């Protein structure tokens, strides 16, 4: 279980995150929604080790992870994707997949260089695994294409594939629907469901209400740095006043 306790983050005296409490049960797909500036991304950054809280704590199981570096949370099985995918643009899709394990360990290039023989021994295994994941994502036909040639939706699938290369326990998905056409969005939704069925937990921040309602339960509603509501899709959908206030629906 991921547990967030009394989490606060201040920037220049302003609370971006203010006394936030919630938990994510292992095996679930939990959604975190809210307007721009609600504090969702800051919360994600703290969980993933890209930022430290001003106060409060985050636990993964019984281990406190608040204040850890991103490569340390990565070692625990927490992988974060980004709203704007970050592939190595000069590499092919397959090369991007195979680079992920070394790229998130917090090691410098020199350390990777002196470990070249060890890396080479793993190359065949990594290649086989990468091709298997690309087939699962329906990207295998694009394996030799430069990643810069991919569409927005294909890049999101590649991000998901890169996350899967590390055998994650939890994936933090940042706006998986952003810049994605409806056809590929359905593909992404299907793949998230299937990965979840493999035992991977998801925490998703998203503005796309359709995706959140289809995929997530429970759903956390965040505004002005605080969690305003937590409930099932039906409970969130039925609170018309809340949706009107936050999303103008």
Where are these regions (language model features)?
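Conserved ABC ATPase "signature" region
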Residues: 110-142, 190-193
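Conserved catalytic motifs of ABC-family nucleotide-binding domains
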Residues: 167
């Amino acid at each position: 279980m991921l547990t967030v306790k009394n989490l606060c983050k201040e920037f220049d005296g302003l609370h971006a995150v203010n006394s936030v409490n919630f938990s994510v049960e292992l095996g679930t797909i939990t959604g975190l929604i809210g307007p721009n500036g609600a504090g969702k991304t800051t919360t994600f950054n703290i969980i993933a080790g890209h930022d430290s809280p001003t106060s409060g704590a985050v636990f993964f199981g019984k281990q406190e992870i608040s204040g850890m570096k991103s490569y340390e949370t990565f070692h625990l099985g927490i992988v974060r994707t980004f709203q704007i995918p970050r592939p190595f643009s000069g590499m092919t899709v397959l090369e991007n997949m195979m680079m992920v394990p070394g790229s998130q360990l917090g090691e410098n290039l020199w350390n990777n260089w002196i470990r070249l023989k060890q890396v080479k021994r793993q190359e065949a295994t990594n290649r086989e695994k990468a091709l298997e994941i690309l087939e699962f994502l329906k990207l295998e036909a694009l394996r030799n294409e430069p990643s810069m040639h991919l569409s927005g939706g294909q890049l999101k699938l590649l991000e998901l594939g890169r996350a899967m290369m590390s055998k994650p326990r939890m994936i933090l998905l940042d706006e998986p629907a952003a810049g994605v056409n409806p056809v590929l969005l359905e593909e992404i939704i299907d793949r998230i469901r299937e990965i979840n069925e493999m035992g991977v937990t998801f925490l998703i921040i998203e503005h796309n209400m359709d995706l959140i309602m289809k995929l997530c339960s429970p759903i956390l509603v965040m505004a002005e740095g605080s969690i305003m509501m937590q409930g099932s899709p039906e409970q969130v959908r039925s609170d018309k006043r809340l949706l009107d206030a936050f999303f103008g629906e």
